[in-house]
């Protein structure tokens, strides 16, 4: 990741199925660049089980909206040509593109196969609850609409370890593990073994699968020109798989390919263990920090803000942390619903955008709002993104000395004119805190960038200033020239 990079997850779950998304992306590229976004994470671009699929019900990864399959040529987001045009528009605006890569499972098979399997418990995949039986499963993927273009590889039961659906019994209380197969030994330990997630579970130990997967990824990188990878559901895939795959890619053709993995766990020890297991070949989203935000937003004044960054990836391994407030999975109605309360979102975004540790990822619905779910945009989020790009530089000093009012200062650097700022947060009453900007700021006035407090803060001869914030809110204080610049560019 680059210094002071700001990523945006440029999609959410409830986008309309009108096929215009890639065109909308291209139209917004220049705006996002002016705002200060340096990278975007786009949704899965390949054909899913239907036109309405958000992209995680993967059917054919070679079909980027090019072939008549699953009742549609385009995906929910548009056609292959429009997708590549959107990537080109982002590149022309100076924005890097991260593609969403979903390798764990396949769905929407073309033909049924009879397969011998045993039944494992959904709650403990190491507990076998049924003996050997014959099941009929949708394990054959022949992609008739594509007709072998790009790859003649087809999938059958040999390429999967199991599924949760038998077409004959239609039971939902079993996971069918194909005989001769075993769940991958190095996955998350939740539910005994969390190799299986959904659909037809891809067998990453199969040599043919490994070869075809790497072939596809090289094809995809060459076809689209994307700059980086967002890796879905990594805790469900054998840990050595991505370690070896990323090493091979970087050794042969893609030396600077960045990757960020989604390992969904609020336990930072599991995140750290995974990073060690993959030799730090990727960054991870800081799910532990997200849950701190969520719990703080629910508890209000009962939450100790001085520990908001404790037990997180960004506090333990900041160079590998991609921080976020919410995403498409935490939205209302989704499987990992844990949406941060509206009042706390500005505080949370200040904590990821205006500090030096980690790479922040802004959620599309927080910036634009979400009419489909009647959700508002986060106030002043655009201003915080601009502040990060222009002024959030230099040494950082924390003042996390109160359970309800915390703050920090950034002391600027010579490379960024007028850089340096002060941030104060409260989860209870109005807050006041003395914070030291440093001697070089002595005599300067700092102004509230959010416009709540009209009177400036004067930095005294020893470099200290007394900063304020309103109850349950955040205040952002910048130098006089920076404040004038923000007003001009509002």
Residues of each region from the PLM?
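Substrate-binding cleft of carbohydrate-active enzyme catalytic domains
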Residues: 75-109
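Active-site-adjacent substrate/metal-binding segments within catalytic domains
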Residues: 6-8, 12-26, 40, 44-51, ...
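Glycine-rich FAD cofactor-binding loop and adjacent beta-loop-alpha segment at the N-terminus
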Residues: 64-69
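Long, low-complexity, polar/charged, intrinsically disordered or flexibly structured peripheral segments
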Residues: 152-208, 222
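Boundary/entry segment of secreted carbohydrate-active catalytic domains
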Residues: 1-19, 196-206
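Active-site-proximal helices and loops of the catalytic beta/alpha 8
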Residues: 2-5, 24-33, 46, 50-62, ...
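Soluble non-cytosolic domains of exported or imported proteins
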Residues: 16-23, 77, 81, 207, ...
């Amino acid at each position: 990741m680059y210094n002071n990079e700001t990523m945006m997850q440029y999609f959410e779950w409830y986008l309309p199925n009108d096929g215009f998304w890639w065109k909308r992306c291209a139209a917004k590229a220049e705006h996002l660049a002016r705002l200060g976004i340096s990278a975007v994470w786009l949704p899965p671009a390949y054909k899913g089980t239907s036109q309405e699929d958000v992209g995680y019900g993967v059917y054919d990864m070679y079909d980027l909206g090019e072939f008549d399959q699953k009742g549609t040529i385009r995906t929910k987001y548009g056609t292959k040509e429009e997708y590549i045009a959107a990537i080109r528009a982002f590149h022309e605006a100076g924005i890097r593109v991260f593609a969403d890569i979903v390798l764990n499972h396949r769905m929407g098979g073309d033909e049924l196969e009879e397969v011998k399997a045993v039944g494992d418990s959904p709650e403990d995949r190491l507990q076998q609850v049924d003996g050997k039986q014959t099941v009929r499963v949708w394990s054959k993927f022949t992609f008739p609409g594509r007709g072998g273009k790009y790859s003649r590889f087809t999938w059958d039961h040999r390429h999967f370890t199991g599924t949760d659906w038998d077409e004959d019994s239609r039971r939902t209380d079993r996971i069918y593990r194909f005989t001769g197969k075993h769940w991958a030994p190095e996955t998350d330990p939740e539910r005994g073994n969390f190799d299986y997630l959904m659909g037809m579970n891809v067998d990453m130990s199969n040599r043919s699968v490994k070869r075809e997967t790497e072939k596809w990824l090289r094809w995809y990188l060459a076809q689209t020109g994307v700059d980086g990878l967002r890796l879905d559901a990594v805790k469900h895939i054998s840990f050595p798989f991505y370690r070896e795959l990323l090493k091979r890619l970087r050794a042969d053709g893609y030396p600077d390919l960045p990757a960020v993995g989604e390992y969904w766990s609020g336990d930072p020890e599991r995140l750290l263990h995974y990073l060690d297991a993959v030799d730090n070949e990727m960054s991870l989203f800081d799910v532990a920090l997200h849950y701190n935000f969520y719990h703080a937003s629910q508890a209000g004044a009962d939450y100790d803000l001085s520990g908001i960054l404790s037990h997180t990836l960004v506090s333990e391994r900041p160079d590998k942390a991609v921080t976020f407030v919410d995403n498409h999975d935490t939205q209302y109605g989704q499987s990992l619903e844990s949406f941060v309360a509206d009042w706390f979102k500005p505080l949370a975004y200040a904590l990821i955008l205006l500090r030096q540790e980690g790479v922040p990822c802004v959620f599309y619905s927080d910036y634009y709002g979400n009419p489909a779910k009647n959700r508002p945009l986060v106030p002043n989020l655009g201003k915080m993104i601009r502040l990060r790009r222009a002024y959030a530089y230099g040494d950082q000093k924390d003042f996390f000395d109160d359970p309800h009012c915390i703050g920090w200062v950034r002391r600027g650097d010579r490379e960024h004119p007028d850089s340096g700022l002060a941030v104060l947060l409260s989860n209870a009453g109005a807050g006041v805190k003395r914070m030291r900007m440093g001697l070089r700021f002595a005599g300067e006035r700092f102004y509230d960038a959010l416009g709540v407090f009209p009177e400036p803060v004067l930095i005294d001869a020893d470099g200290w200033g007394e900063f304020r914030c309103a109850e349950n809110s955040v205040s952002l204080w910048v130098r006089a020239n920076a404040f004038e610049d923000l007003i001009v560019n509002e």
